[in-house]
């Protein structure tokens, strides 16, 4: 209405201005005509009249010019005002049109979810289902695992710092279109020179052990021109001649029993069988109890039912263990402090990195491995001496007697390695994500202690390359993962987890901030039974991925079906045997380990760290068509994609805390028994139990339920005008993911475990006395084992604080 009134007022003023202009412009012309007519009429004028007339004319002209300038200014102002008014109207019109268009779009535009928006804004239009389908199809249509296994095995010398396997891995990544990054480290490591064992009778050599496997028919790996004798990485150089004693598995309990039975074990060569505990701890225990050196052999008795004693033929004619089998190993104490023993707690990043003395992290006595066949004549001479120890033995004519040997029966042992600083290289491929945090890391080592290594190193490396190939197909379809993904080929793992430990120590701050999960491939294919060790947080995503993975190409039989049929889909505890050690126990990054391994009752016996771990053995007794490799590549890749492609971290905190709660209940009863009259200990233990119970039965359930609701919100399609709801969901999403990533890190302690400061995870660690199994609540357990009241109180206080922080985090 006001605009109409202003318009009318403007038109009225405009009309008045025009009238004035017409009048003023007409007067000069009329006066001029009148003056001309008078002059013509009179016919003549006087000079005075002319002068007067000129003066009047000048005055009139000046007056008319002043009027003309004023009128021009008014007209100009009017035009400017008119132009301004037109622009204002135009802007109003534009604004109104824009609002109308936005309203139309808001009313009729397709609904979108927060999940889809993440991808649209980053030009990634593949849905989760399409991502899974493309990845699985790429691996189902082609399986290159056999090619990779043979390529790696063909180099026949894939130890630490091997250049051939490094170059092959690097070239494969480059051919797929990746830009791999090479990280070099410089650890202190040994190169085997010679090992020798010879039994002596009255000072004379009875025979010299071969210290190497037989050349067998049909297996090219055993006929390689360059073959390495059995050795122990990080064993002490030296030669020893002494009497010997059989010490069963070499555990602390075995040695306590030997001392209880008054067996003389001082300054003897201790012969122990492999199994039960890590080789390094066997040598460590032997050194502690006065051994001069150690021999470790593999007893077929520990192979279960598949033995020659039970009628099975040995390899290559049957599934039983070949009697000439020798297991090479590392004997550094990596269940205490993994990695380079001369750079504990920091990476050997440069060639001039300071290296400390390895004392306390490696043995100070020599040790060597032997075959069952070579050790048999030595053990046989112990019969009737000492007492019988252990569960039994399949060493021919040996009754498991401890000895020691007679004064005329001795063994000469020689061990020699050359120790130097060597360059090692890990190869890393990064796939950037839409999010900058929440990395999923997949790792596999390519080194081994024996040539070939088809089941151990080469299978894991082949599967890693197949996963990379499947993801390269996705990248060609314009895929960009929500979370970043890394694939890493480790070096030096079999020597003592060198590559992964150096990497974790070098990138500790970044990994704590960004890493979400570490997935490990080690000894990936050595049998047909699927086995999984994992942090309980990952249970749900592992089960879901297994259900969506076809087992060996069978559409109606999933990996989960096979897993449940063979072992009831059991997820075991992590131990201290592989590359996940640094991630889980040092940094608090949830980890999982996957493998197909042998069945003790019917499966072929696996020849670990031996020349018999060859493609021939693999194809003959385990995986002739390499479909297990294909199944594993699909499963691990699918697990990675499920973690990466979901906006919400796929962690189940209730399952996680329920496991911890059950663990603690077991230790709580032990605490009451160990300190029955100690009110302070029992009161503190009860407070921890009550706090953990509330966190498990209330906080974790509520947190998981809220995450379930949030998951649906992220997938809910909303109109454009409801963008504020997406903003609220996004804020909640960021907060939830941050909490999920922090939960495991809350159990990282600065002090670490007693005498194992590098192990900082208070919920789980490799067993201090076995190493090959995981130990729950290790600080509390070790304090209880030593009946150390101060240590128990310290760990109860730590757990009380940590569980309080968990409750606060989940609320």
UniProtKB/Swiss-Prot annotation:
| GO MF | aminopeptidase activity; carboxypeptidase activity; metal ion binding; metallopeptidase activity
Q: Where does Zn(2+) 1 bind?
A: 456, 607
The EC designation for this entry is 3.4.-.-
**Binding residues for Zn(2+) 2:** 445, 456, 522
Pfam families documented for this protein: Peptidase_M28, TFR_dimer
Keyword tags: Aminopeptidase, Glycoprotein, Hydrolase, Membrane, Metal-binding, Metalloprotease, Protease, Protein transport, Transmembrane, Transmembrane helix, Transport, Zinc
**GO CC terms:** endoplasmic reticulum; membrane
Q: Which residues are glycosylated?
A: 55, 237, 568, 599, 670
Which compartment or compartments is the protein found in?
A: Membrane
Q: Name one GO biological process term.
A: protein targeting to vacuole
Q: Where is this region: Disordered?
A: 1-63, 334-367
The cofactor note reads:
Binds 2 Zn(2+) ions per subunit.
State the family it belongs to: Belongs to the peptidase M28 family. M28B subfamily.
Q: Mention any additional remark.
A: Present with 112 molecules/cell in log phase SD medium.
Which PANTHER family does this chain map to?
Answer: N-ACETYLATED-ALPHA-LINKED ACIDIC DIPEPTIDASE, VACUOLAR PROTEIN SORTING-ASSOCIATED PROTEIN 70
Listed name of the protein: Vacuolar protein sorting-associated protein 70
Q: Which organism is it from?
A: Saccharomyces cerevisiae (strain ATCC 204508 / S288c)
